[in-house]
Amino acid sequence: MLNYTELENKNVLVVGLAKSGYEAAKLLLKLGANVKVNDGKDLSQDAHAKDLESMGIEVISGSHPFSLLDDNPIIVKNPGIPYTVSIIEEAAKRGLKILTEVELSYLISEAPIIAVTGTNGKTTVTSLIGDMFQKSVLTGRLSGNIGYVASNVAQEVKSDEYLITELSSFQLLGIEKYKPHIAIITNIYSAHLDYHETLENYQNAKKQIYKNQTKDDYLICNYHQRHLIESENLEAKTFYFSTQQEVDGIYIKDGFIVFNGIRIINTKDLVLPGEHNLENILAAVLASIIAGVPVKAIVDSLVTFSGIDHRLQYIGTNRTNKYYNDSKATNTLATQFALNSFDQPIIWLCGGLDRGNEFDELIPYMENVRVMVVFGETQDKFAKLGNSQGKYVIKATDVEDAVDKIQDIVEPNDVVLLSPACASWDQYHTFEERGEKFIDRFRAHLPSY
């Protein structure tokens, strides 16, 4: 960790605890700042809050009193806290500096950064790059939205290692100096409009990933969305990926992944399922090549890497039916990819938090859907969708009940796919919890020998 002294004796207010706020507060204390933590929820019984208080950090919870801004603190905002929260709006009015925990990770480390963002595919790309590093002599440390708090990992990473960081639009909004050596934008579609309010705001948040890059850095983008960045004043070297045509970067030709005229691997040898994952693979391969990962290590990864938990994750077979856990599909685009990944009849488990979306854009991808099992707040919307397409629709109370209900109607070689197309927060704390419940219920129905 760098000997970073700019926050020494400065007043810093961490808004929003959770995991990243907790780690940020501890780091700020280590950097010599005068730290307070504020959260709108009551944290009187929270273990992390009590731990911070034992270190001498004042925790104010249950409301957002503006008096916390009177000593002109630097604000470190948990990425999940919208800028429309009252205390953040007031801080902005007063002209106070507002950072996120990811910015701290950059300030305290000299390690080069590979940063990955996008509406879909960012977790897969981040994990795959990490696996490619692991297969080589180079060291890459996963961090960010993938589950490892960036500022925590940044304290441990060495200057000759890479930080491989997944970034959400929430995290990117608060960057000031953050500069990845290699930035990847997998794709940008409409998402999180409940947070960003407009598609333009969401797109602009994603574009923050390259705003500080120089001519010595690299930007990797989807060729078929190049219009989103072509008008920008880019300094970084820009490369593209495409599954459809030759581009300045990496592409697929005659069934092979090709970079710089060199065939890397035949796509038939890839283990990761789904047509959409070809784009994720191209982005990961290109970033790893730029970072210096040997081609042999890249190929070793591609012939063994089968994906990440909760993203089109194959969890097993019961009788002749393969089960796939795609709980991380919290929007319709991710579910489009999932439905498009199978030629067999699909029993589709879907539903969740109602964000006001309609789901008609899924209709072109429902050809192979034989049965829909619907649950959650959007249950009636999905039932209406299924009925309009002549699908057999079953209503369930939750994911576990959905798995129970299909046992008597599943037919040989049906694929059972959990791909909710919705967030999980109506019934589960996280998409991971929802996915684990699905896996547990699948296992409960396995025959015992």
Swiss-Prot record:
It is found in: Cytoplasm. It comes from Staphylococcus epidermidis (strain ATCC 35984 / DSM 28319 / BCRC 17069 / CCUG 31568 / BM 3577 / RP62A). One of its GO terms (molecular function) is ATP binding. Pathway: Cell wall biogenesis; peptidoglycan biosynthesis. This is UDP-N-acetylmuramoylalanine--D-glutamate ligase. It comes from the Bacteria. Belongs to the MurCDEF family. Its EC number is 6.3.2.9. SUPFAM superfamilies: MurCD N-terminal domain (SSF51984), MurD-like peptide ligases, catalytic domain (SSF53623), MurD-like peptide ligases, peptide-binding domain (SSF53244).
